[in-house]
Structures are given as structure tokens and as C-alpha cells.
Amino acid sequence: MAVHHKRAGAHRGRGSKPGRGRGRKFETSRLKDVSEDNSSGDEERANVEPVEEPGDSEGSVVSSGSDLDDQPRENSYSTLLKLLNNDAKSNEPARKKRKIRPNEQHTSLSELPIPVEGDVDPGNELVDMEESEDEIIDDADSHLEDDIDGLVTDGRNDPFESHFGNPDESELSQKIEACSRRWRSIKSDLIDGLYAVACSPDVEQATSVVLPTTPTPVDLKLKRKLARSAISFDPLSTCLTPYIFGYRDTFFCSRTTQNSAKLRDIYCLHALNHVLKTRDRVIKNSAILSKEDGGDIELRDQGFTRPKVLIILPTRQACVRLVDSLTKLFPMEQQENKKRFMDSFSAADNDGWVNKTDDFKELFGGNDDDMFRLGLKFTRKSLKLFSQFYSSDIIIASPLGLRTAIEKEGGKKLENDFLSSIEMVIVDHADALIMQNWEHVEYIFSNLNLQPKEAHGCDFSRVRQWYLDGHAKFLRQTLVFSAFNTPELNALYNSQMQNAFGKAKIMPKYDGAILNLRLPISIKQTFSRFDSLSPLKDPEARFQYFTRTVLANLSRSWTETSSGKGKLGGTLIFIPSYLDFVRVRNHFANSSQTANISFGLISEYTSVQDSSKARSHFMNGRHSVLLYTERAHHFRRYNIRGVSNIIMYGLPDNPIFWGEVVEYLGTAPGGTTTTPTLRVLFSKWDALKLERIVGTARVRSMLLEKGGDTFTFV
């Protein structure tokens, strides 16, 4: 479980153990640790750069990443000059190319020659040298059926045609211009407590952005080969598929362990449908150009490079599940490098996790390495794993793995042209990516759909016009699936999801995590609101409120005993942010306000040995206070005993953590005479977190109430 904090340490590194950090161990005499000689040697050893596993070298881990260093370079401007010069030298007058619409019947399909799959895409100069004979399309009848299937369609009914194949240029121009000015939105209720906020660029005579449900998979415009193995629909599928298969940007904020497999099947089916339609169109048009000798026909059906779908996942095991879903929906006769893939990406679950929660097992089960990237190439009869990026149709990667493919050491750009023609981005388990390092995700999005620096063998005469105009980001579809919403995800939705055809945010209505506590006794839950002028000033306002109000009252009533556990001993302080954790830790170590308090520390950077020691001392009373971060809980899910009081310095992002942490109060020793207490600090900038804890019906009054700033639940 590699941990990467975006403000602490470098962005590189990987491993299978959690809680690694590059900072020195925090030491203070107030920790009252008698075994001071046992320093954080384990923590330092965890910081050593990992050794590559056998068979998992750059060529295999990176798969398609190794091709980024060795590609032939050609200046795209020089390529254009060559084309112009060749035309100028010709004695014959230039013929005007005739543009062929997708639904125009130019020639009989039965007259088309049988093209070669591996060579039909002029934009792919980096095809694999070991092309197999299976990539030759040797079945004319099969090819004819595929041409009819999905290519000769009514563009008004197929979202692929209206979005990518043949969009109305005038309407598209208006929508792109409106994207930077104003959006209009409509809110509608869905099923099971879900509701959608659908948005579209505000243009004249715009159609409604509320989409009807899709009753069955038959209503989807699928390739025939996919329709045969299409998934079954449940109520959630009928609500989501209109936005996903309609090429709208979609932000789904209710991902769970129960629906994650269904969501994965839905977006895999959509990605496959998009890739197959794109490749079949290129094959058909290449055949037309071959038949007509390419003289007077203009067919724009490509981007600058071949990769069309980017899927961002948190772990290698998640990648295994995704590839399994792809091959289930689109069975292939051959799967090249499958054994190599399973050996380097898959692993067995930990047998000692019987008591771990389902969300923990789903995320960290199997191979939880967060450093990987993989290219997938589809041919008629085979799927090739570990294909080079420039000859791949789908790229699957972790944020860290993809960033290291783009950057060199020192932040120097290495290569991002393979991201120039991405038409679909899928971010699954986004809440887990936030706990890794969200800055990597932001960096990847900043490198999408840029004009390429090199030609890469691109045939510019076949590049779609909106690519040449630099408008690809307005047609790219972005799908984000998360267990909950956060400010980081909201920022991504507002800044990077700029689909000219619209977008939708689908969210649940919360009952509140406070209603689902499993405690043997009832406890008083006190929420204290403090004033904060802006998100930037919120950390300072929170710290001042904590030290002057909460900690001051705590210190005055503290009664130390010889064992170090007094009246308010066994106090757990839960701190979501690591930077806030460092500030509170330093205050406990250096302030006279806490001079008589012994405390322990557990953060995501604390070694396993030191964490065990801190938990033991806290349970035995040698530490009166334990500082505990949200990311430490995310990666380790400790069961901390001896907790009599909880102070939440801030609300957790994950509502599951609320119940797990508050239920520590049920593990206090049976002889404890003090009544367990819970106090929570929040400001108006915590609205998203607060809604998940207290419920949608209560959050508004708690944020706007002017009669007081303290709210109590029993």
C-alpha cells in the first residue's frame, strides 16, 4: 500500500507496505517512551527505493512506457512542408478533395478490398514489429458483416456519429464557445435516493439536458459483437447509461463495493464500443481511399495518435479486474502476454484480513502496488497486452505510473504526445486516488489533448478538424466514479470536464452516518462550528479554535496520575490533514499548554513498529493522548483500544471512517467510570463532509443556524 502525500516527499516511489515517509522520526521527551533506543529503523528502510521485481522491469511494468524513449522523431511542421512541396512540384493542377459523409453511400461494400488491420492507421508509426498473421483480415464475409454493423448507421440516432463521427460543425462551434461562458443546469431525481444535476452549454435552442432512462441493453447502439455479450441492466444501469453511452461527462458519487463490478462492466462496454467503432471506421475509410486511389476524397476519421481511451486506477489488482471485464464482454481467440500480465499484476488476498471491512479488501486485496501502466491493442482476433503506447487503443495506468512515463527526473518533460488524441478518460475509485496523491491526477489532466510535438507518422489529411483547431478537450468524454464527493473532485468537474455535449453529476441523498453507529451505550455527539473567512484561511482558524477553546478546556480539567492516565485520559484526536497533524504535534511537543500531557503519534508515515508501540502505550495509559490521521486509518484500519474520549479536529472525507473511529469508544475498559464523549470541529467549508455525517436534511441548518454554533446529537 504505497502512500504518496502530495506535500511530503517526492512523487516517485512504490511498494507494498503502507506508511512510508522520507522525513526524520519525530522525537520528544513527552512521548514517555522507555525504549527510546528502538528508533525508526524500519521507517528508514521503508524509504529505500524499491528494487525491480524479476520479470517486472521497465519493459514489463511500463509495458508501453519503454517505447517512449526510443521513438523516431520527426518534426510535424517539416512533414507538412514536405507534403506542400510535393504538391507544388506536380505539373498537374491540384484536385479539390470531396468530403464523404459517414452516411453517404459512396461505393458498394462488397466492392471494397480486404484491408490489413495492422497497417490501416496512418497515424500509427510505432506499430509492433512482430505483427502476427492473425492480424490479417482474411475472412471477407466477416469483414463485410462488420462494415455493415455500426458503420452504415443513421448518425442522428447513434451518439458516436453525432459526437465524433459527424457532428454538426455550426452547432459544435456554438457549444464550444458557450463552454467558457455559461452553463445551464437541471436537477432531477433518479432512483434509490440518487439525484442528478445535468449541465449543458447555454446556447440558443438547446435541447433538454435531462436524459430518459435506457430500459435494456438492446436500446444501446452497440457493435453486434458486443451486443451478443451485453450485460444485464439493473435500475442503476438504466439511469447511468444514457449519460455514459450518450457521451456526456459523468461524475458518479455513489460508488460502493456492491455496485463497483456493475459500474466497471458498464464503462468497459462503452470503452470497447468506442474503440471498435473508431477502428472499424478507419479500416473502412482506408479501403475507400485504396479503391479511389485517394485522389479526390476527404475522409477525416482520426486523431494525431492511436490511443483513444485512458483508464486511471489505484492498484494493479484493480487493473486485473478491469482486463477480466474487458475479455468477458469481448471474448478474443488470443490474448497475447496474458500469463506475463497475471504474473506481474495479480496476487492472492491476505488471509489475515478476515476482520477487515469490505471496502478495505476491495482496494488493498491482491496486488496493491500503485506504480503501473499498461497498453492494450485490439485486433480482429486477438488482444495484445503490454503493447507500446503509440500502437495501443486503451491505456490503463495508475496516476504515479503514468506521470513517470511523462516526466524525467527533475520534472523535465519526456513525452505526452500519446495523450494528444484521448477521446475518453475513465477515473475509477477516485476516492482512493485522493488518498494516494491527487496532484498526479491533476498533472495527467493538464497533459491531455495537447497539440503533439512530433508527427509520429500522422496523416494530417485524415485528422478530424476539431483536433487541428485544438478543441479536442471539448469533445473528450470524462467519467469519474467515486464513493463520495470532495473539493478536489468538484474542482476536476468544474475545470476539466468541459464536454460541449453536456455533463452530469449524480449524487446520493444521505441519511447520515450518525444514525448507523454500533455502540453498546449511547454517547453525546457534540458538533462545534467555528468561523472561517475562506478555504485558504480555514487551517489557521481551525488551529486557533482548537488551541484556545477545545485544548484549553481539556488542559484545565486534566488530572494526571502516576500512570499518566487521568480524568480525561484515553483521548483520541483524529486529524484528517497531515499538515494539520504536524502543526498539532508540534504544539503538543513545545507548548506549555500541554507540558503535563504525554501523547503518542500515528500518521501515514509512522512505521508499523512505532505504530504498534504507540497503540500499546495508549491502551495501557502511558500515553494520555493519541494523535491519529485519516490517511493512517485509510491504509491500516487499526482497531485502537482504550479510547474514552474522541476529538475530531476535522471531519473525515470517508463516512465509513466516522463509524469505525467513533466505535472505538465501545472498546474502553469495563471499569472506566467516565462517560464517553465525542466532539467535532467543523466550518462552512466542510459542507460536503458534514452532509455525509449528519444527513442531507440536517446539514443546511447546521451551516446557516445563527442561534448558536454548538449542535448535540444523542
Curated annotation (Swiss-Prot):
<dbReference type="GO" id="GO:0019843">
    <property type="term" value="F:rRNA binding"/>
</dbReference>
<dbReference type="GO" id="GO:0005730">
    <property type="term" value="C:nucleolus"/>
</dbReference>
<dbReference type="GO" id="GO:0034511">
    <property type="term" value="F:U3 snoRNA binding"/>
</dbReference>
<keyword id="KW-0698">rRNA processing</keyword>
<feature type="region of interest" description="Disordered">
    <location>
        <begin position="1"/>
        <end position="120"/>
    </location>
</feature>
<comment type="function">
    <text>DEAD-box RNA helicase-like protein required for pre-18S rRNA processing, specifically at sites A0, A1, and A2.</text>
</comment>
<keyword id="KW-0690">Ribosome biogenesis</keyword>
<feature type="compositionally biased region" description="Basic residues">
    <location>
        <begin position="1"/>
        <end position="23"/>
    </location>
</feature>
<keyword id="KW-0539">Nucleus</keyword>
<feature type="compositionally biased region" description="Basic and acidic residues">
    <location>
        <begin position="24"/>
        <end position="35"/>
    </location>
</feature>
<dbReference type="GO" id="GO:0000462">
    <property type="term" value="P:maturation of SSU-rRNA from tricistronic rRNA transcript (SSU-rRNA, 5.8S rRNA, LSU-rRNA)"/>
</dbReference>
<keyword id="KW-0687">Ribonucleoprotein</keyword>
<comment type="similarity">
    <text>Belongs to the UTP25 family.</text>
</comment>
<dbReference type="GO" id="GO:0032040">
    <property type="term" value="C:small-subunit processome"/>
</dbReference>
<dbReference type="InterPro" id="IPR010678">
    <property type="entry name" value="UTP25"/>
</dbReference>
<dbReference type="InterPro" id="IPR027417">
    <property type="entry name" value="P-loop_NTPase"/>
</dbReference>
<dbReference type="InterPro" id="IPR053940">
    <property type="entry name" value="UTP25_NTPase-like"/>
</dbReference>
<feature type="compositionally biased region" description="Low complexity">
    <location>
        <begin position="57"/>
        <end position="66"/>
    </location>
</feature>
<protein>
    <recommendedName>
        <fullName>U3 small nucleolar RNA-associated protein 25</fullName>
    </recommendedName>
</protein>
<comment type="subunit">
    <text>Component of the ribosomal small subunit (SSU) processome composed of at least 40 protein subunits and snoRNA U3.</text>
</comment>
<dbReference type="Pfam" id="PF22916">
    <property type="entry name" value="UTP25_NTPase-like"/>
</dbReference>
<dbReference type="InterPro" id="IPR053939">
    <property type="entry name" value="UTP25_C"/>
</dbReference>
<dbReference type="Pfam" id="PF06862">
    <property type="entry name" value="Utp25_C"/>
</dbReference>
